[in-house]
Amino acid sequence: MSKIKNDKRETGHLKSPPETPLLNRVRFPSDLKQIPEEDLPQLAEELRAEMIDAVSQTGGHLGAGLGVVELTVALHYIFDTPHDRLIWDVGHQAYPHKILTGRRDRIRTLRQEDGLSGFTKRSESEYDPFGAAHSSTSISAGLGMAVARELSGGQRHVIAVIGDGALSAGMAYEAMNNAGALDARLIVILNDNDMSIAPPTGAMSTYLARLASGRAYRGIRDVGKKLTSHLGKSFDRAITRAVEHARGFVTGGTLFEEMGFFHIGPIDGHDLEALVPVLRNVRDNGTGPVLIHVVTQKGKGYPPAEAAADKYHGVAKFDVITGAQAKSPAGAPSYTKVFAQALVQEAREDKRIVAITAAMPSGTGLDLFEKEFPDRSFDVGIAEQHAVTFAAGLATEGYRPFAAIYSTFLQRAYDQVVHDVAIQNLPVRFAIDRAGFVGADGATHCGAFDVAYLATLPNMVVMAAADEAELKHMVRTAADHDEGPIAFRYPRGEGTGVPLPQRGEILKIGKGRIVREGSKIALLSLGTRLADCMIAAEELEAAGLSTTVADARFAKPLDADLIRRLAREHEVLVTVEEGSIGGFGAHVLHFLAHEGLLENGLKVRPLVMPDIFMDQAKPEKMYAKAGLDAAGIVKTVFAALGQAEQAARA
């Protein structure tokens, strides 16, 4: 067991990094294989202590990683990574994996600028054969690798670790169905950390799992294949049925077996004496796809996380001894909270309002809605495609559905947005959280593309909130809009602190607002860059450049009158948005070109997120790097005017 020394940390409690004598001998999985098997439980305890200490300093995903410590040790002990491919679904449980694969010396840089990613990442390590952060992709990727191995005549194993929550997404079943049809050799580890499928039943379950993974039991399947080869394909169905019937006497049939997987388990995912022999047997025996059902506990080994798994899924920095998480200084309410409270307020007035989330009730704020309206709140699981079409179905019957989905996750349901909502002009309301840069979660969670992929659709209305008061207006506007689909986007984090109206106002569709009058420079903002535009306007004014600032509010439909006025009355027009190329600025440029407003010397400069996937950092640093802060806006204006010296100083 690891020990805690006494030493002062910034929390004021006495503690220091844990003692990890066995773990200190392991830099890579090849070192792990030199540890005697009977010492693996101690190594796992040291690995767990190291992870707790690291995440206490960085924040991040804690519970999931603690739940797979023993599984991680066993997988790297038995399989020959990186030659064997080990894929972690989502990747937020991969912190122990990172520690064992040459990244321990950087583990306290998790999710920091220039540090380790909070997820698996191909460019970070050869031990990460497939990057992840969105769920339910591992089996598909693993199957692709397994088929590539067969095509090239290789011998490596491919292992995909997927959680029971991720199995709520259809993609996982599509991959399993394909794997079964191909009869490809693929090992899937089902990490069941909610005991939502079936718990283990003690020693007998472990015995059956160990037996089922060995040669004798797998022989039933092999016998069936040999009979088929001798008797011909006409007998294949009858033989398969007989084999499955024989196996059913031992463990019973399962959905996984119906898909063509050999099913082992459930087994205790924290018992290395059970895990290691089963994984060894699976490694050394059989062909075709196999699923090992492992039951684990989120937060295992850290009492605060065991007692409140939901609160310790993703954590801020925390005190290891007490479990108390660091709290940010009290400030303005978060955009997420303002959205949720505004939606609850509207739902009190309108029984047709229903709320839908795809496994993110807390992240989207809909847990507040669910408390007051449990019968009108729907968590559909990690199933964004279903969420959107489910909302469309509700809309056909006169309800007013709000689908609250992160920008990055709505990408998973784009065809449903197009085919099931926009083409049919159904009034589904999309509350798009985490718009723009999101900080520590990096490129995989960045909300860069929603304006570009939504504003191109006929019938769609797209709004972006400049502050939390505007967000309340947009919730009310969306609730009132029955003419077709409507979306509104807002960022992660706290609002600006502006006074909130008692209730939001219904905005006129396609109309923006002037928030500052000027005569030479026009800054047209979509979203929360408005605050930086106001700061930039002050700096430009001080330099003798009278500046107008406008809040577009709508990316679609555009406020044509506002844009015409800004173009005709100013020398420079800068559009500013928290999105990719092809979004709001592109629509404005298209409009200006079509109207002939680019032919009279107007200097237009669209400011967008750079055409790269930016790694994690603090959001304010990311916006500065992208040139989307006040300094970047000022620099752009000076450059447009040909004032290179001033631009360089900005």
Curated annotation (Swiss-Prot):
Pathway assigned to this chain's UniProt record: Metabolic intermediate biosynthesis; 1-deoxy-D-xylulose 5-phosphate biosynthesis; 1-deoxy-D-xylulose 5-phosphate from D-glyceraldehyde 3-phosphate and pyruvate: step 1/1
Keyword terms of this UniProt record: Isoprene biosynthesis, Magnesium, Metal-binding, Thiamine biosynthesis, Thiamine pyrophosphate, Transferase
MF GO annotations: 1-deoxy-D-xylulose-5-phosphate synthase activity; magnesium ion binding; thiamine pyrophosphate binding
Segments of skewed composition (Basic and acidic residues): 1-13
Reaction it catalyzes: D-glyceraldehyde 3-phosphate + pyruvate + H(+) = 1-deoxy-D-xylulose 5-phosphate + CO2
GO terms, biological process: 1-deoxy-D-xylulose 5-phosphate biosynthetic process; glyceraldehyde-3-phosphate metabolic process; terpenoid biosynthetic process; thiamine biosynthetic process
Name of the protein described by the UniProt record: 1-deoxy-D-xylulose-5-phosphate synthase
Gene from which this protein is expressed: dxs
